[in-house]
Amino acid sequence: MELAHDGPLAIPLWINGRACLTVGNQLFDVVNPVTGVAQHRVPLCGAEESAQALAAARDAAAIWTGLGLSGRQDKLAQLATALEGYSGHFAKLLMADRGVAQADAEAEVVAAVQVLRADKLGQSGVLGLVVGAERPLLAAAKVAPALLAGATVVIKPSPKAPSAAFALCELASRCEFPAGVLNVLHGDGPAIEGLCTAGVDALLFAGEESLLGPVAELAARHATHFVVLN
């Protein structure tokens, strides 16, 4: 994380296997709903950053599909094991962003590990995944079936709870996922619309009901294939 002007630490983007900052000046404070304290900040990205993240995912597609199903299974198994090993750290991230009880945060990490170990095949292609603020780690982990099918992905977490998705992508890099297979783009509507205009193959959604309509409307506006994950 980096300093964001004189405020809290800023969580950078994760694009092409590394953390990167954006030159944009719009920042969103991630406030713990229990304490009311701003834990950190995220940039509110637009079309330029969306296109950059999607290009990284597109460039990674050949090497990721080239691993074959068994190779991708191995990588996801490594990520699940690593997440299990860092379960305490991820639980703390969830507690800080969402203000949930420790038991609830720990249960979410366990559920995310189970999802990463599943053998179901999902959507293929170069995808965007919009994640809500409720159970953000579990929602981000729901990308696993698509990854297993050979998809490369740009995750757009809620600016209210972005830490877990960023940390998951960083952990995937430590597990030697090819650069660009998993990327994180921060922001809200303009970031999602940027993925659509940049030609994402499909937009996946894993979030709360209140966000479903607006995200689906953005996808429909640009004739982008839209999939709701259970």
Task: Identify the residue ranges that each predicted region occupies.
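N-terminal Rossmann-like NAD(P)+-binding subdomain of aldehyde/semialdehyde dehydrogenases
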Residues: 1-123
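Rossmann-like NAD(P) dinucleotide-binding subdomain of oxidoreductase/dehydrogenase enzymes
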Residues: 121-230
